[in-house]
Amino acid sequence: MPSVKIKENEPFDVALRRFKRSCEKAGILSEVRRREFYEKPTSERKRKLAAAVKRHAKKVQREQRRFERLY
């Protein structure tokens, strides 16, 4: 759980912004959204596999564009 020490004479808005940023870095909101509803193990595997395929296709496309620029 992220915690923020409020410095002396620090405005509340600044401390809140730092807290939000630390929560975002820790991935708390994405974790809450992911756990909001139960996901069957097969659905989770399917989603992760689809994400991996998408990442791989994006990586291959990026490499293809890089090689096109060289020639």
From Swiss-Prot:
Protein name as annotated: Small ribosomal subunit protein bS21
One cellular component (GO) term of this entry: ribonucleoprotein complex
GO biological process, one term: translation
Record-linked Gene3D superfamilies: Ribosomal protein S8
Recorded superkingdom: Bacteria
Membrane-spanning residues: none
Molecular-function annotations in GO: structural constituent of ribosome
Taxonomic classification: Bacteria, Pseudomonadati, Pseudomonadota, Gammaproteobacteria, Oceanospirillales
Family the entry assigns: Belongs to the bacterial ribosomal protein bS21 family.
PANTHER family the record matches: MITOCHONDRIAL 28S RIBOSOMAL PROTEIN S21, SMALL RIBOSOMAL SUBUNIT PROTEIN BS21
Alphabetical UniProt keywords: Ribonucleoprotein, Ribosomal protein
